[in-house]
């Protein structure tokens, strides 16, 4: 394993960690970054799964006390059971649709135009929702995660289905969807973090089972570098985002998405990046 390959794995791990939990689409960024870096190992798809796993481990570490409290409280605490039920309810719709339409999504939507359109449409949706937030005089209806109802969770779960379209962003769909349905900005952000845990863990197990032969002695070092880079950068990003949403809205991310969407369209049809 040469130093150039190590640096490329490190860079892609950082890109994943910085974009997985921001409403900007980690998929689009990984495609562009991977192509510019000419990072196309045989295990590229498995590498993407590994660095996603590293990113979600950062959320698990950040919320380790809450997760432990929920797990240990399931037998006796109503709040723990309701929290778990809400996460399950919000997870089911996207998982069901992903299993049904996986091949169609990869064959039809994994191209410059759909990804660019999704980025721009997602940016416009953020601007619209933030505009509604500014016009409202009353506070958001849901001020804490524990106040979420199963119906609230279902609505956020349906919003998460939009993330099956490459470029829409899972975090963007759940955060902005949550805000649209009455969740306070920080509550929507934290619930999005928790929803990522079963979704990404499930995707990791599914893809690993499909392509377990990619995990061999030659690839372990590369995977480990990407995983650690994604973990560290995601941990820093999650902490930063929680501070950011306390006093800022998501308008800046909306304009960034729109600009990045146009950039993806440009480089996609210029031949600068490869769509595989």
Curated annotation (Swiss-Prot):
Catalytic activity: di-trans,octa-cis-undecaprenyl diphosphate + H2O = di-trans,octa-cis-undecaprenyl phosphate + phosphate + H(+)
Keyword Repressor in record: no
GO aspect biological process, one term: peptidoglycan biosynthetic process
Molecular function, one GO term: undecaprenyl-diphosphatase activity
Membrane topology: Multi-pass membrane protein
Alphabetically ordered keywords of this record: Antibiotic resistance, Cell inner membrane, Cell membrane, Cell shape, Cell wall biogenesis/degradation, Hydrolase, Membrane, Peptidoglycan synthesis, Transmembrane, Transmembrane helix
Its EC number(s): 3.6.1.27
GO cellular component: plasma membrane
Tree of life domain: Bacteria
Subcellular location: Cell inner membrane
Spans through the membrane: 85-105, 108-128, 187-207, 217-237, 253-273
Note, other: Bacitracin is thought to be involved in the inhibition of peptidoglycan synthesis by sequestering undecaprenyl diphosphate, thereby reducing the pool of lipid carrier available.
Job description of the protein: Catalyzes the dephosphorylation of undecaprenyl diphosphate (UPP). Confers resistance to bacitracin.
Protein family: Belongs to the UppP family.
Name the record gives this protein: Undecaprenyl-diphosphatase
Source organism of this protein record: Burkholderia mallei (strain ATCC 23344)
Protein's gene: uppP
